[in-house]
From Swiss-Prot:
Cysteine pairs bridged by disulfides in the record: none
Record-linked NCBIfam families: PRK00015.1-3
Subcellular compartments: Cytoplasm
Residues involved in a divalent metal cation binding: D58, E59, D149
Protein name, UniProt field: Ribonuclease HII
Chain ranges of the RNase H type-2 domain: 52-240
Annotated organism of origin: Xanthobacter autotrophicus (strain ATCC BAA-1158 / Py2)
Cofactor note: Manganese or magnesium. Binds 1 divalent metal ion per monomer in the absence of substrate. May bind a second metal ion after substrate binding.
Keyword Manganese listed: yes
Gene that specifies this protein: rnhB
């Protein structure tokens, strides 16, 4: 039987994992020659053309069997661009955490989550686009231009450029990828504490051997994406009714 959660995470409540973003959005013409980090050629051209603010957006969590898709949108301050920005997957956890705090302290940041229920209802593509669009809409400032990773951009009320591999090329997108990755990892660590039998804090919901064994032993929990084939295959007679769950140690 699957263990009963000790206490389900409440992402809507104030959480130290999500420090309040600070900083002012850049203004047109604010670009300087002293920018550091990834290639700012694209942003520099946009600011020089008077299209400000420029936002970057990215998501994390399309592939896992459990947990939300987390999307982030970031408007970097050209005068305070963090050094060392890169694709979040290329950074160590310690470096991501350090950059995350710096981004939140110096940039405008917004986050949106597409939970498993929305993923199952709408499909992963539509849920991801929904999260990206909501992250952009949640920015304190309305961007004039959006740079987004990939080739499938969301519908938003500004001009958009999709860049394949953008999280490793464009600083604004890299910053968004770091924010999304850190937020999702922290959320999944909380889910792991509530559902210790699944090891979410180690595999973050991805389809690892450990996760597959836990699914086979316990069936899906409420954080699993039931429309995903490996989870769907475990639902036939394996998932206990709500009153049958046992208390976790």
């Amino acid at each position: 039987m699957a263990p009963r959660p000790k206490a389900p995470p409440q992402p809507a409540e104030p959480d130290p994992a999500l420090p309040r973003p600070r900083g002012r959005p850049p203004k047109a013409g604010a670009v300087t020659a002293g920018w550091v980090g990834l290639d700012f050629t694209r942003e520099r051209a946009l600011y020089a053309d008077g299209r400000a603010p420029v936002a970057g957006a990215d998501e994390v969590g399309r592939g896992p069997l459990a947990g939300p898709v987390v999307a982030a949108a970031v408007v970097l301050d050209p005068a305070r661009v963090p050094q060392g920005l890169d694709d979040s997957k290329k950074l160590t956890r310690a470096k991501r955490e350090s950059l995350y705090l710096e981004i939140c302290a110096t940039a405008e940041v917004a986050i949106a989550l597409a939970p498993p229920e929305r993923i199952d209802r709408d499909n992963i593509r539509q849920a991801t686009l929904w999260a990206l669009a909501n992250a952009v809409r949640g920015l304190p400032c309305r961007p004039a231009f959006l740079l987004v990773d990939g080739n499938d951009p969301p519908r938003v009320d500004c001009e958009v450029e999709a860049i394949v591999g953008g999280d490793g090329l464009v600083a604004s997108i890299a910053a968004a990828s770091i924010v999304a990755k850190v937020v999702r990892d922290r959320l999944m660590a909380g889910v792991g504490a509530a559902f210790p039998a699944y090891g979410f804090e180690r595999h973050m919901g991805y389809g690892t051997r450990e996760h597959g064994a836990a699914l086979k032993a316990h069936g899906p929990c409420l954080h699993h994406r039931r429309s995903f084939a490996p989870v769907r295959e475990q639902q036939l007679g394996l998932f206990p009714a709500p009153g049958e769950l046992e208390e976790a140690d």
